[in-house]
Amino acid sequence: AKGLAGGVPIGACLADEKCCDVLTKGTHGSTFGGNPIACAGGLTVLNKVTSDGFLDKASQKANYFREKLSEIPEVEGIDGIGLMIGVRLKTKTAADVCKSCLDNGLMILTAKEKLRFLPPLNITYDEIDEGIEILKNVLK
């Protein structure tokens, strides 16, 4: 939910028509639901994400990122959707690589034995290249 309002706490509940018939007015709510600051943040993000070409650009960046990752000899495989990317390594452990990346200015996560990349949708190509260079140096 963090990305829903650009880092401002907000949540959303999506339901199909059958469930919506059960959730009638006043049957679902929260103490701080509808906070105007959170809603303004959510609306701003929604407007940005639905603007012309935004998601196409994010998809192009994801493809570019995956292509650059696949060029690294130590990379065994790449999984994920869009810019949510998991990388399997041939020999090094994800935990060790993750720590070394952080020590060199690249913040990534792990999921079991995969490196997890979760950049923002508005990441730049230069930022992708910088991250790739750090990863390459760590994997040498």
Model-derived features: where do they sit?
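Conserved N-terminal phosphate-binding loop of PLP-dependent enzymes in the Aspartate aminotransferase
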Residues: A1-K140
